[in-house]
Curated annotation (Swiss-Prot):
Disulfide bonds join 32-53. It holds the Pfam family Anti-LPS-SCYG. This is Anti-lipopolysaccharide factor. InterPro entries: Anti-LPS_factor/Scygonadin (IPR024509), Anti-LPS_factor/Scygonadin_sf (IPR038539). It comes from Tachypleus tridentatus (Japanese horseshoe crab).
Length: 102
């Protein structure tokens, strides 16, 4: 099933990977935000990732992973998956965004 949607998430992650724990990002013409917070779960460091675009949609991508980059990647994947399922992002928009980072 992945294909273009996985590529879209990865293109977005490439852009966010250079950024630190939180910030703003333009995605398909919308102001979006991401945040990564460290936490301890079962005596191990984990990172909670969140990606959201409040001026565009109420969808929020979330993930908890053992690395900061993993938390960003999986919260973005979660957002893209929800946005695709709700019809918020078209395949054409995804391809246009991806082409900027190839």
């Amino acid at each position: 099933e992945g294909g273009i949607w996985t590529q879209l998430a990865l293109a977005l992650v490439k852009n966010l990977a250079t950024l630190w724990q939180s910030g703003d990002f333009q995605f398909l013409g919308h102001e979006c935000h991401y945040r990564v917070n460290p936490t301890v779960k079962r005596l191990k460091w984990k990172y909670k990732g969140k990606f959201w675009c409040p001026s565009w949609t109420s969808i929020t991508g979330r993930a908890t992973k053992s690395s900061r980059s993993g938390a960003v990647e999986h919260s973005v994947r979660d957002f893209v998956s929800q946005a695709k399922s709700s019809g918020l992002i078209t395949e054409k928009e995804a391809q246009t965004f991806i082409s900027q980072y190839e």
